[in-house]
């Protein structure tokens, strides 16, 4: 019997594939075979098994699947373009990806992929088709590697069309490490055309550095050689890294980071501190490689500066940077960030050489505008000039400048070059085109060899004119492609577009070989994996799929949040290091809270200082006076004071006040006028006011030294005498001077003269002005003396027995304010009454202000102008109008030139009492309510003269100050040191407008000019001579900038040189600003016709044609008249006021005060007319409603802006007429600003009585009226109609309403003939007048109502005679007949009643005899109406 075992042995097992089978069998077939072999046997029933033959299993055929050729090719191209080896195709992660994309995809073997790559690289065609290129051919090269292996990367740039430049990338491995120009250029030329490479030549080549440029410049293959822009920037940054402040700071940062990473204990503590704050844990990586990594490392460390400082403070780590080093490094970081920004912009694929010059100018402007006064800034400027001198002043300068000119993104921009430079560059391009050789002529599409030089000049000149206009109007953005811009305008500028493509084709930077073959490069791995031949094939294929990446390209890892953190940290630390410059003169900063309040506030940037490398000066150094303002006895030699950029200035206080500490601040006290207090009662003194004891009685006080007087003979003689203000002539004018401690010090010339009653007064010089004097005793040692000054060293001492505050001088009221001559102002001169800024009020509202205030005060000298007979007694009382307290201002600038007259030295006591603090608080509240200041005269910062505010200018432009100082130095009025001090002052600079004319004259004389435009063409040596002096004041200014500054100043102030004679030549009236009256236009229309109004010259009317041809709109504009409101429109309020514009009575809160200055008041009166001037009051304040101004006339705080005038638009009346023949028919009339209008219905021409007439009836009626015999029977007592009209004068078109009175004499009115009443007559109401009974009989209720044409003629002043003729003063009316027998109404001439002004009409009317046109009852001519008998007989009006 056969057992199960033997049955199994006799079975034929399934065939297993041998190892020699192809590896291309799919994984599914292999898995299916293995499952068939390992399948378990079938379960059989127990018992004897019979022998039977089992059928053999069917063998599955193994299919050898091949990969898709297209899939293999695409996979090979992708792997090699990214520098990935082919073996990565069988990685599990990639297989899983492919199985997810396509489960049936077959991955090709590695050897198949390598063979495919070799085949593609050997059979591929060149990327650049040299025969089909358009325009120039450019190439950039770069070499990377070490001494053993070197790799070459180059890019070829060409044009296939006119709109875009193509870029082709090539990657090669060099066989020899020693470079040879012939082999290098041959390799590049074979890439373009491998068969005839000797014909390939390049227009431009960009080399990575000077060494390679010198290597290939000997060849004749290239026309122009350029060096990569990134090389110049790298050279500049390398010089920056060698600066001691920068290198030491970077070394400290690297040492600290290495220490943190090497010490595990420190690093764990740092991480725990960051975890508590939920902040970032990683420490910045140390830089390695180029300066890009250094900039990123520096940025991240500075962002972490506060964290590192806190950590070092907790663990007492000393080797970290301090705040001053941080300020130095933040300056370096911002400069490196600017360099990275421009390198990143110039490394894009479509970059051009035209972007180089704007990038350099941007970096230079950043250095000039961020001058912080550091010592190393001069070295930075020198390094910048040295690094970029080959571009800005080398042999390749013209190539870069012309490329910038032909780039529409930067052409003709003032930020790049001046207008004169752009014109000179245009001239160079024109000369090159006119004088081009035959080789360059082939570049153009047309044959220009047949054109002569004049024709070429005209062509290129016209194209430049069109380009200059188009580049301004259609300027592209900086990120757009300039080649596309030129391609779109090829037809408009045919020759100039070819020249522009020739210059713009060259890239600004070379290709970056380090990106491909450097450390961590894209192809670094395959370079060390494959052999030379296999690597060469891979690189040849990989270059076809690369985009151009220039040197300097980097990823911007500096986020906006990092920049904000840096700015906030820099702002705070800048104020901590230079706290004195931001403390606003407060010298008692003792607590950390005060420091934080100053540091935490927003701060302005540090001042720009001219002298950067000058050492500090001791504080006792005196300020040199102006040479011309010194007396003859003063020494002529004076060393210039050196500017200290970081030194905190000494604390300064007001010249007429004293500092009063209150709540941690110092308040200042200045004299205040008597002001009517219209505020709520002052609250009680707060509880937190400190109480301090009264000072003890001092034994003596110290008098301030007297400076040397100034003689008027030392004033500059070049100033015209009419412009010099002599302060000694009018003492009353000097009383109007406002003490302005905010801008300038208060100086005088005291002399020691005894004054009775224990005080010392000084007799002031002729140039001093009176002021209120405050003397307060101070407890000082006897040996103490005042600070040094320019005055004599002798100091008089006096004794005071009580510590009281006295007020020496006149106690008059408010100082009068001067208003210059005007019609309105003359009223004040006649009444000898001046306008006060605040009305005087004798009520006492100040509370405790009249108590004794023995507080800390400045030691001042008595006023010498007080009366000698009025001794200054110490009464211990403070007048309520003596002082006003304000927060202390910022005096962080250098001393002004004001102290040339002499500065008062101030002495203080050390104690306060409770009464003084309470009074200070009360006065401070009063000051806050009245912030407005008095109109004042100011002192010129140059000459020291006192002028009114209108004759001074607050100079805020730095260039204007520079040129004014330049003129003063050339005239010998200022020394160089004094000019440096003037440029360093930070307070407001008020300068006489006369100095601008003097400076302009000095510029004209210095540069030998005739006009302002001559500055652009003046010789360079004259500019260089002026630059020597300017460089001492502002070292960063170059010659081109100085030329532009001079030109702008001359253009802005050239009107000061124009004389009245020159202005008259220009047609302007210098003394009378009224424009000349235009000549009346003549009317040349034929006199045989009646001229319609459409062709007449309107009087104060504007004709506007409507859309329809038959209508005309007439806008009558009347003169502006001030509105007058009705009494019902007035408002009832608690605080009423009357508007002088509309006479409306309303709340004062909604009104403004009318300005009182001469200039503004004159403009208002000129605009609003004499009626507005008549409404102004002299003794009370004048108000005007806020509603009379537009919304734009007010500032954000609700104040009226200077120069704003109320709306004074004249009223307009719009009337629309329809033209029918020669007649105008009025349709509607509307007044501006109202809804009132009048209109008639032309379709229904109804008469006043309601009867409708057709056109034929009207003409027939007019025919009968004019053809009828005028000889009607009249009574003997009643004259005829013709007699009445012949005796009446011609009345003008405009009649004035005039009451009839007996004073005018008897009226010569004659009763008209008695006719049948005309039904169409209109009743007229006559005014009640005192007339004679005879005149009353002649008046009727009906007017004379002739025909249509006659009515129109009579309205215009014509008179109808007895024979039917209608005549005027200079014309007659002649009726003519039509072919049908009807008359034609036509006049021989017309009478024009247009007058130039309404006032002329009134005057002429008054001259004519007053004869009223008679009222004629009924119609003298024409047929009577059918219903005439139905009307009642009219009766004359009664006397009621």
UniProtKB/Swiss-Prot annotation:
The keyword Transmembrane does not apply. Residues 1317-1329, 1418-1430 bind DNA. A zinc finger (THAP-type) spans 1135-1209. GO terms for biological process: cell differentiation; negative regulation of Ras protein signal transduction; negative regulation of vulval development; regulation of cell fate specification; sex differentiation. It comes from the Eukaryota. SMART domains: DM3, THAP. PANTHER family: ETS CLASS TRANSCRIPTION FACTOR-RELATED (PTHR22716:SF1), ETS CLASS TRANSCRIPTION FACTOR-RELATED-RELATED (PTHR22716). Synthetic multivulva (synMuv) class B protein. SynMuv proteins are required to repress the induction of vulval development. Acts redundantly with SynMuv class A protein lin-15A to negatively regulate vulval development. Regulates let-23 basal activity. This is Protein lin-15B.
């Amino acid at each position: 019997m056969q057992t199960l075992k033997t049955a199994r042995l006799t079975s034929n097992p399934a065939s297993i594939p041998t190892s020699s089978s192809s590896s291309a069998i799919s994984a599914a077939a292999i898995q299916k075979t293995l499952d068939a072999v390992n399948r378990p046997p079938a379960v059989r029933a127990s018992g004897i098994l019979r022998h039977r033959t089992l059928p053999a299993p069917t063998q599955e055929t193994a299919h050898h699947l091949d990969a898709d050729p297209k899939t293999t090719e695409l996979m090979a191209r992708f792997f090699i373009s990214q520098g990935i080896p082919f073996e990565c195709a069988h990685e599990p992660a990639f297989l899983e990806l492919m199985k997810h994309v396509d489960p049936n995809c077959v991955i090709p073997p590695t050897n198949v992929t390598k063979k495919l790559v070799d085949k593609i690289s050997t059979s591929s065609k060149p990327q650049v088709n040299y025969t089909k290129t358009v325009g120039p051919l450019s190439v950039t090269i770069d070499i990377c590697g070490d001494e053993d292996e070197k790799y070459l990367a180059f890019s070829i740039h060409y044009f296939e069309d006119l709109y875009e430049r193509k870029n082709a990338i090539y990657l090669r491995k060099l066989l020899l490490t020693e470079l040879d120009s012939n082999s290098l250029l041959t390799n590049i030329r074979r890439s373009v055309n491998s068969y005839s490479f000797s014909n390939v030549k390049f227009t431009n080549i960009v080399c990575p550095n000077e060494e390679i440029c010198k290597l290939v410049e000997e060849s004749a293959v290239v026309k122009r050689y350029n060096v990569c822009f990134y090389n110049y920037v790298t050279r500049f940054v390398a010089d920056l890294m060698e600066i001691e402040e920068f290198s030491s700071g970077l070394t400290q940062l690297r040492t600290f980071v290495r220490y943190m990473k090497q010490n595990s204990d420190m690093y764990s503590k740092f991480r725990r501190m960051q975890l508590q704050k939920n902040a970032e844990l990683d420490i910045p990586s140390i830089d390695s490689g180029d300066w890009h990594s250094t900039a990123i490392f520096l940025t991240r460390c500075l962002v972490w500066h506060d964290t590192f400082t806190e950590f070092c403070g907790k663990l007492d780590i000393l080797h970290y940077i301090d705040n001053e080093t941080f300020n130095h490094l933040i300056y370096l970081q911002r400069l490196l960030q600017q360099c990275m920004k421009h390198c990143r912009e110039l490394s894009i694929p479509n970059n051009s050489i035209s972007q180089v010059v704007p990038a350099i100018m941007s970096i230079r402007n950043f250095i000039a505008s961020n001058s912080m006064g550091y010592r190393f800034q001069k070295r930075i400027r020198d390094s910048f000039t040295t690094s970029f001198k080959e571009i800005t002043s080398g042999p390749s300068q013209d190539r870069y400048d012309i490329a910038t000119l032909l780039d529409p993104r930067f052409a003709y921009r003032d930020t790049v070059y001046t207008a004169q430079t752009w014109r000179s560059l245009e001239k160079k391009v024109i000369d090159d085109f006119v004088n081009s050789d035959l080789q360059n002529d082939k570049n153009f599409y047309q044959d220009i060899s047949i054109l002569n030089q004049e024709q070429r000049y005209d062509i290129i000149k016209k194209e430049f004119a069109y380009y200059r206009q188009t580049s301004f109007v259609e300027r592209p953005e900086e990120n757009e492609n300039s080649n596309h811009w030129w391609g779109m305008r090829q037809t408009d500028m045919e020759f100039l577009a070819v020249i522009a493509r020739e210059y713009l084709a060259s890239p600004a930077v070379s290709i970056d070989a380090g990106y491909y073959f450097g450390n961590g490069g894209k192809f670094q791995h395959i370079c060390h994996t494959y052999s030379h031949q296999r690597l060469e094939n891979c690189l040849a294929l990989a270059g076809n799929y690369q985009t151009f990446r220039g040197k300097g390209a980097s990823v911007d890892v500096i986020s906006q949040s990092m920049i904000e953190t840096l700015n906030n940290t820099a702002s705070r630390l800048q104020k901590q290091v230079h706290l004195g410059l931001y403390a606003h003169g407060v010298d008692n900063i003792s607590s950390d809270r005060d420091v934080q309040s100053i540091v935490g506030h927003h701060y302005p940037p540090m001042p720009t200082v001219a002298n950067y490398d000058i050492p500090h000066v001791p504080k006792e150094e005196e300020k040199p006076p102006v040479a011309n303002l010194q007396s003859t006895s003063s020494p002529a030699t004076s060393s210039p004071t050196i500017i200290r950029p970081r030194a905190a200035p000494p604390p300064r206080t007001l010249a007429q006040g004293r500092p009063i500490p209150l709540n941690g601040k110092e308040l200042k006290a200045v004299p205040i006028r008597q002001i009517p207090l219209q505020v709520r009662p002052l609250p009680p003194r707060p509880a937190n006011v400190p109480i301090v004891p009264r000072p003890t009685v001092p034994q003596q006080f110290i008098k301030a030294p007297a400076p040397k007087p100034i003689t008027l003979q030392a004033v500059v003689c070049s100033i015209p005498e009419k412009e010099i203000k002599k302060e000694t002539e009018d003492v009353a004018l000097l009383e109007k001077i406002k003490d302005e401690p905010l801008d300038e010090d208060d100086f005088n010339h005291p002399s020691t003269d005894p004054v009775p009653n224990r005080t010392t007064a000084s007799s002031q010089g002729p140039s001093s002005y009176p002021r209120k004097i405050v003397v307060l005793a101070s407890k000082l040692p006897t040996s103490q003396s005042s600070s040094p000054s320019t005055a004599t060293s002798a100091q008089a001492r006096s004794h005071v027995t009580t510590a009281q505050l006295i007020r020496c001088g006149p106690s008059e009221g408010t100082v009068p304010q001067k208003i210059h001559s005007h019609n309105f102002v003359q009223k004040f001169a006649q009444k000898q009454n001046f306008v006060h800024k605040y009305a005087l009020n004798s009520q006492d509202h100040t509370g405790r202000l009249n108590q004794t205030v023995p507080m800390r005060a400045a030691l001042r000298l008595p006023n010498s102008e007080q009366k000698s007979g009025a001794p200054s007694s110490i009464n211990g009382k403070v007048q309520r109008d003596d002082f006003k307290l304000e927060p202390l201002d910022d005096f962080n600038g250098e001393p002004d030139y004001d102290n040339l007259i002499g500065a008062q030295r101030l002495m203080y006591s050390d104690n306060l009492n409770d009464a003084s603090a309470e009074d200070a608080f009360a006065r401070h509240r009063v000051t806050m309510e009245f912030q407005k200041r008095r109109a004042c005269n100011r002192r010129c910062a140059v000459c020291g003269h006192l002028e009114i505010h209108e004759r001074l200018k607050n100079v805020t432009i730095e260039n204007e100050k520079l040129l004014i100082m330049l003129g003063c130095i050339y005239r010998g009025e200022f020394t160089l040191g004094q000019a440096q001090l003037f440029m360093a002052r930070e307070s407001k600079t008020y300068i006489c407008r006369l100095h601008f004319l003097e400076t302009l004259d000095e510029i004209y004389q210095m540069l030998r000019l005739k006009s302002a435009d001559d500055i652009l063409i003046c010789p360079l040596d004259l500019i260089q001579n002026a630059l020597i002096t300017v460089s001492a004041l502002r070292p960063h200014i170059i010659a081109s900038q100085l030329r532009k500054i001079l030109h702008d100043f001359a253009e802005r102030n050239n009107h000061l040189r124009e004389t009245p004679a020159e202005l008259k030549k220009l047609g302007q009236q210098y003394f009378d600003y009224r424009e000349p009256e235009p000549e009346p236009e003549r009317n040349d229309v034929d006199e045989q016709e009646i001229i319609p109004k459409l062709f007449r010259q309107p009087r104060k009317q504007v004709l506007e044609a409507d859309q329809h041809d038959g209508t005309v709109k007439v806008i009558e504009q009347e003169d502006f008249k001030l509105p007058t409101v009705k009494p019902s429109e007035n408002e009832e309020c608690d605080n009423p006021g009357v508007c002088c514009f509309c006479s409306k009575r309303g709340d004062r809160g909604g009104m403004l005060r009318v300005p009182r200055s001469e200039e503004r008041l004159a403009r208002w009166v000129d605009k609003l007319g004499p009626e507005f001037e008549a409404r102004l009051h002299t003794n009370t304040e004048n108000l005007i409603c806020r509603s009379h101004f537009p919304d734009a006339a007010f500032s954000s705080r609700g104040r009226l802006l200077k120069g704003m005038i109320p709306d004074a638009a004249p009223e307009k009346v719009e009337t629309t007429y329809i033209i029918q023949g020669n007649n105008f028919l009025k349709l509607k009339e509307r007044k501006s600003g109202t809804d009132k209008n009048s209109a008639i219905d032309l379709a229904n021409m109804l008469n006043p009585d309601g009867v409708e007439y057709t056109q034929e009836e009207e003409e027939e009626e007019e025919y009968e009226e004019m053809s009828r015999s005028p000889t009607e029977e009249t009574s003997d007592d009643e004259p005829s109609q013709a007699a009445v009209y012949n005796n009446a004068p011609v009345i003008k078109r405009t009649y004035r309403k005039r009451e009839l009175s007996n004073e005018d004499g008897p009226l010569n009115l004659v009763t008209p003939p008695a006719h049948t009443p005309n039904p169409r007559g209109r009743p007229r109401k006559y005014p009640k007048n005192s007339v004679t009974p005879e005149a009353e009989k002649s008046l009727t209720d009906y007017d004379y109502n002739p025909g249509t044409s006659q009515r129109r003629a009579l309205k215009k002043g014509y008179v109808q005679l007895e024979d039917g003729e209608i005549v005027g003063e200079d014309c007659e009316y002649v009726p003519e007949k039509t072919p049908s027998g009807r008359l034609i109404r036509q006049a021989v001439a017309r009478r024009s009643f247009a007058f130039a002004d309404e006032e002329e009409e009134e005057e002429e009317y008054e001259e004519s005899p007053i004869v009223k046109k008679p009222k004629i009852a009924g119609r003298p001519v024409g047929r009577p109406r059918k219903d005439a008998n139905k009307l009642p007989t009219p009766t004359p009006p009664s006397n009621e």
